[in-house]
């Protein structure tokens, strides 16, 4: 009787309450820890400032960026990337979505102490701008090519990038969607080399989507007739992009092909920085996605060696790659090889 009374008094469970998000877990978004400190940064509610706060007290510590004080050519900031030394930041605006995780934007370099701001590059189509570990350089992708800059001089690392043919440093649609990432390059530990994945999708078949006025944001140019977006989309069983690995030596300006074995129809689903300047970690996977291998590759010689092999009965989840941690002497790897997700130390 008592249990029945409690159940009757409880809130009614219906479809609306289930789908409204009322039972979703609470979590914090929009904060970024500042490396080497006990602070985190966040964008103000009006988008006009980037502010630092104390983890211990939750109180505001400093205004790192202010649109008006910096005399920035923008009304608000949409995102930012702090430099590892905490002295500068990248801020971006005018972002436009490409696919689920990727976007193009106009980036600016802001010096926090001097309160000066300058454009990262010309145009509004820069992608995945990333600081080198020593905070001296920034790598980014524009028009499917990789560029590096120190804030004064811009160097174009690749020149063969072309829409629907060759992509450098960012994943094609399949990689972004299936492996849940939007940056396919990585600095080495001291910023003297940059490694990346190159996607040759010239032989992949094209798929076309119709575009309508009622999209968000509204596309008024399609009021009378729909538009069309055509891109390389390999259906199940069809050819994927042909992938290869490359590195760029910041001192010599030379590029080098990296020798990391992979099946003819296999994947390079991640490339990551390690604490060792002579090593990048490259992940490989077979087409069935049930066998993953990690290789340590030297960006200066191109040679590699296998360090981990992960095989599972069904398929390897993308969080295994995204949430693995590469340390100085060990690698922490999530795995559900026995049916349950555990952490394994190598």
Feature names for model-found ranges:
Residues 55-58, 111-115, 150-153, 160, ...:
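Short loop/turn segments that connect beta-strands within beta-propeller blades
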Residues 1-4:
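Bacterial N-terminal signal peptides
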Residues 15, 21, 58-60, 94-99, ...:
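Predominantly five- to eight-bladed beta-propeller fold
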Residues 24-43, 70-89, 107, 123-139, ...:
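Conserved beta-propeller blade repeats
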Residues 42-69, 97-100:
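Beta-propeller domains
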Residues 47-53, 99-106, 143-147, 203-210, ...:
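Structural motif
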Residues 60-67, 118-121, 154-167, 256-259, ...:
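Beta-propeller fold detector
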């Amino acid at each position: 009787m008592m249990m029945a009374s409690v159940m009757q008094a409880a809130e009614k469970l219906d479809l609306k309450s289930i789908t409204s998000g009322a039972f979703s877990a609470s979590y914090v978004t929009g904060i970024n820890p500042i490396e080497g400190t006990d602070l985190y940064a966040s964008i103000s509610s009006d988008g006009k400032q980037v502010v630092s706060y104390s983890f211990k007290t939750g109180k505001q510590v400093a205004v790192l960026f202010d649109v008006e004080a910096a005399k920035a050519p923008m009304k608000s900031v949409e995102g930012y990337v702090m430099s590892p030394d905490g002295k500068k930041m990248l801020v971006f605006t005018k972002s436009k979505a490409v696919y689920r995780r990727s976007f193009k934007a106009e980036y600016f370099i802001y010096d926090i102490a001097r309160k000066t701001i300058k454009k990262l590059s010309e145009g509004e189509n820069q992608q995945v701008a990333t600081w080198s570990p020593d905070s001296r350089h920034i790598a980014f992708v524009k028009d499917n090519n990789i560029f590096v800059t120190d804030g004064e001089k811009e160097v174009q690392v690749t020149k063969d990038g072309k829409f629907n043919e060759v992509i450098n440093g960012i994943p094609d649609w399949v990689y972004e969607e299936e492996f849940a990432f939007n940056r396919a390059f990585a600095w080495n530990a001291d910023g003297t080399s940059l490694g990346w994945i190159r996607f040759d999708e010239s032989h992949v078949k094209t798929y076309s989507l119709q575009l309508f006025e009622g999209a968000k944001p509204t596309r008024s140019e399609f009021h009378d007739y729909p538009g069309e977006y055509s891109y390389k989309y390999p259906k199940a069983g069809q050819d994927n992009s042909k992938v290869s690995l490359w590195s760029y030596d910041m001192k010599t300006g030379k590029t080098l092909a990296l020798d990391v074995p992979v099946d003819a129809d296999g994947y390079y689903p991640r490339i990551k920085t390690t604490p060792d300047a002579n090593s990048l970690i490259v992940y490989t996977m077979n087409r069935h996605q049930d066998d993953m291998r990690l290789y340590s590759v030297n960006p200066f010689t191109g040679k590699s060696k296998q360090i981990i092999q992960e095989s599972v009965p069904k398929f390897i989840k993308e969080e295994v790659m995204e949430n693995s941690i590469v340390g100085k002497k060990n690698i922490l790897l999530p795995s559900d090889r026995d049916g349950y997700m555990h952490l394994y130390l190598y």
